[in-house]
């Protein structure tokens, strides 16, 4: 998918870019796979903001995606490649030979008319899903499960990929996009290939309004607030932070503090951290 560059007809259009959507084959989604999506605007059930900078945006329908890929041995044909407003990756509508329709994450190189299949005996082809233990070393994969049968949780964003490095007993070593090397059960499934729409990260939003269309509200710096609103606020002119280290709006340390639980059970499955050389 290419990048479309706009002429600077207005200040908002200057330097603005967008995807050309050349891979998209239809703009009409499969109605049976849509569910309504309520805009929470970052509020919880008490009406209080629990996630800042969310609200507004264009109304969306949620597309039901098959992350489990557990219809073993049943072939499916790719019918369309579609845009999904709820994720950075594109999605593909597939029709199984038994009549079932499903959406999957569209990997790079997947084309309309291509046949895909899931199961331990599936070929190592783009779009096929099989257990990690059955995938050869060096293969690039995405949509990786962390628990067998739960559905893919890792490597689902546009352009993301992971690589199978080897096998140790019942575990398979996988190098993630961040550089982290992790042990995952060999019975967990993954899909062969890289997630498509890899140029999505190169798009220049161009103007504030495009972020608002996505439901993203402005982020105000703490240093321009009053001291009763933020620890960085107050002072005369452009005042420094005034504390030992930067803080969140609630006084907790920010920028660099590790937030992962040191006693997490999955720590033993991480062979190499993402920031280790």
From Swiss-Prot:
Give the record's GO biological process terms: cytoplasmic translation
Keyword annotations from UniProtKB, A to Z: Ribonucleoprotein, Ribosomal protein, RNA-binding, rRNA-binding
Q: Which GO terms describe its molecular function?
A: rRNA binding; structural constituent of ribosome; transferase activity
| Disordered, as annotated region | 219-277
Answer yes or no on keyword RNA-binding: yes
Q: Which GO terms describe its cellular component?
A: large ribosomal subunit
Ranges annotated as biased composition (Basic residues): 259-277
- InterPro entries xrefs: NA-bd_OB-fold, Rib_uL2_dom2, Ribosomal_uL2, Ribosomal_uL2_bac/org-type, Ribosomal_uL2_C, Ribosomal_uL2_CS, Ribosomal_uL2_dom3, Ribosomal_uL2_RNA-bd_dom
Question: SUPFAM superfamilies, alphabetically?
Answer: Nucleic acid-binding proteins, Translation proteins SH3-like domain
Protein role: One of the primary rRNA binding proteins. Required for association of the 30S and 50S subunits to form the 70S ribosome, for tRNA binding and peptide bond formation. It has been suggested to have peptidyltransferase activity; this is somewhat controversial. Makes several contacts with the 16S rRNA in the 70S ribosome.
Family designation: Belongs to the universal ribosomal protein uL2 family.
**HAMAP family, sorted:** Ribosomal_uL2_B
What quaternary arrangement does the UniProt entry report? Part of the 50S ribosomal subunit. Forms a bridge to the 30S subunit in the 70S ribosome.
What is the designated name of this protein?
A: Large ribosomal subunit protein uL2
């Amino acid at each position: 998918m290419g990048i479309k560059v706009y002429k600077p007809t207005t200040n908002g259009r200057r330097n603005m870019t967008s995807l050309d959507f050349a891979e998209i084959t239809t703009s009409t989604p499969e109605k049976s796979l849509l569910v309504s999506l309520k805009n929470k605007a970052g509020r919880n059930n008490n009406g209080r903001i629990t996630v800042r900078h969310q609200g507004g945006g264009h109304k969306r329908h949620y597309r039901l995606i098959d992350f489990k890929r557990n219809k073993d041995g049943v072939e499916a044909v790719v019918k369309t490649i579609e845009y999904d407003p709820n994720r950075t990756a594109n999605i593909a509508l597939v029709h199984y030979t038994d009549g079932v329709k499903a959406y999957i994450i569209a990997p790079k190189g997947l084309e309309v008319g291509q046949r895909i299949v899931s199961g331990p005996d599936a070929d190592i082809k783009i779009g096929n899903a099989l257990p990690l233990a059955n995938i050869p070393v060096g293969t690039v994969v995405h949509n990786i499960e962390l628990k067998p049968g739960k559905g893919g949780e890792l490597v689902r964003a546009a352009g993301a990929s992971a690589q199978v490095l080897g096998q140790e007993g019942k575990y398979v070593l996988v190098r993630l996009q961040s550089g982290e090397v992790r042990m995952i059960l060999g019975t967990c499934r993954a899909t062969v290939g890289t997630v498509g729409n890899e140029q999505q990260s190169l798009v220049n939003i161009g103007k504030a309004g495009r972020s608002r269309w996505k439901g993203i509200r402005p982020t105000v710096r703490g240093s321009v607030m009053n001291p009763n609103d933020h620890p960085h606020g107050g002072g005369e002119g452009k005042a420094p932070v005034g504390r030992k280290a930067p803080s969140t709006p609630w006084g907790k340390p920010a920028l660099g503090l590790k937030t992962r639980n040191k006693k997490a059970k999955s720590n033993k499955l991480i062979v190499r951290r993402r920031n280790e050389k």
